Amino acid sequence: MEPNLLEIPLWRAAVLALVPLLYAGGGAAATVLGQRRGAAAWRVARWSAALALGAALLSLGGLLAGGAALLRGPALVTLGDAGAVHLGLRSDALGGLMLVLISFIGWVIVGYSQPYLDGARGQPRYIRGLMLTLAAVSLLVVSNNLAVMALAWIASSLALHGLLTFFDDRPQALIAAHKKFLASRVADLCLLGGVALVGLQLGTLEIDRAIAAARALPATPGTLQAAALLLATSALLKCAQLPVHGWLIQVMEAPTPVSALLHAGVVNLGGFLLIRVGALVADVPAAQALLVVVGSTTAVVAALVTMTRISIKVSLAWSTCAQMGFMLMQCGLGLHELALLHLVAHSLYKGHAFLAAGGAVAQQRLRQMTPAAPPLSAATWGLGALVGIAVVAAAALAWGLKPAAEPALWAVGGILALALVPLLTGPLLRAGVLGALAGLAGATAVALAYFGLHALFSGWLGSASAGAASPALVAWVLVCFGLLFVVQGAVRVWPRGALARWLYPALFAGLYLDELFTRLTFRLWPARVPAMPGTLAKRPVPQPDMQAPS
């Protein structure tokens, strides 16, 4: 539900505008100071990030004290019947939470980057790209204008491209960045097309006014249905969903802090867009179906592929792909509050996971020192599922959630129940009855916290869970994740069985989807990359009148 927004006080508007300006100023300072004064450039970047975090927290405090509000701002460009491009700023729960999240991640990554890149060439270029990416993302989350949001999203993608190609002598990094560049440009066209259709149909690009105008219509016209499909497609492409997911897996050649920024604060912006303009997509069944089918399929496939990976960073990348699919599926089901909860939790976890990836070897050694758990049986796996379903159902009923009123929410709760099975079976196998009781207590706490946070985020967003999700989509989701649970259980119970041996080659290759997409991208727009060391491209080619050495 779109809240009634008041005019924002001037000081709150100034604090909101200060966040992207601080990041942009830090990027400009890095350009001016250059390589010779790299230490000074890093100091400016750290101070800019710290002040931006402080401004974001101050803005959140103003929001909690004064409520949601906005500043219309002046019209920069008039687009006739499609409205105008306003520098309008919006202070609400969604934008405030995202602004603090982005500023916190930015502050951590800036501090991590300096020692990580110590001695590397091109540090001013890195600082500039990092700060401009943060500036564009922070502008996106505080804007109340669809055109400004679209332009900020495009700017963040272009700035991030410079970070992904920071090591310009690594062919794999350049190939992955090239594939992302092409997918992002297609997504940009979809985004701009969707924004244009919204403006032409509703006569405004201001988000609050556009949503109010759309709700006033007796039925959703074809123009808005096409706009919803374009916006959903843009989000799917930007969030690296199948089959254009390969670049997300292969950008591991980029600096580690860039991977953390990408996975924690940029790739999930598609979810933010769908939450922000959710009312424009929620009444279009085709757009909902697109998000649910593609998102759930990506989540299931990526989760299975993750089981075959040994590399920590590659495993995390496949995990991000799956998590983004799950988030978009929630948006398609109308569960925007759960999608926001998922977005925030994933950002914090994945940012930490990438920055702490260097300690994975020590953690693995500690795990190897612990006694091995007894083998898992099919009966134990099935019993864990039944207990998980009972725990989640009890927690949902304790929060007053009725299955008939909110089937989509209960479907996601069923997925949570299946996800709790390792938490229930692991302690049982390792510590017997006491372990089982500890696992049961932990699962109960997780389920209660999940539905409690759902209620909290629902109140912040001013909306209730969507109970109008198509029964067919709810059934599709349950079948997909039920199949995932069965396959994962079979592989864990019989790791050398026929099913595991049959699935492993295809899953390890990612079902060969990225190979097809890579061929297509290079056929449409070949990339210029340096030859990999040790390849034939580096060796002299004998001429016809010369005899090659024997």
Predicted regions span which residues?
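Transmembrane helix-loop-helix hairpins at membrane boundaries of multipass inner-membrane proteins
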Residues: 1-15, 25-128, 208-211
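Membrane-interface and transmembrane segments of multi-pass membrane proteins
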Residues: 23, 33-40, 428-455, 463-550
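C-terminal ends of transmembrane helices
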Residues: 27-38, 107-119, 162-172, 239-256, ...
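Membrane-interfacial loop-to-helix junctions in multi-pass inner-membrane proteins
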Residues: 35-55, 118-132, 144-150, 169-190, ...
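Internal transmembrane alpha-helices of multipass membrane proteins
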Residues: 47, 74-168, 187-189, 264-265, ...
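Juxtamembrane/interfacial segments at transmembrane-helix boundaries in multi-pass membrane proteins
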Residues: 64-88, 148, 155, 189-244, ...
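Alpha-helical multi-pass transmembrane bundles of energy-transducing inner-membrane proteins
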Residues: 129-214, 324-366
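Hydrophobic alpha-helical transmembrane segments in multi-pass integral membrane proteins
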Residues: 136-143, 193-203, 268-280, 328-341, ...
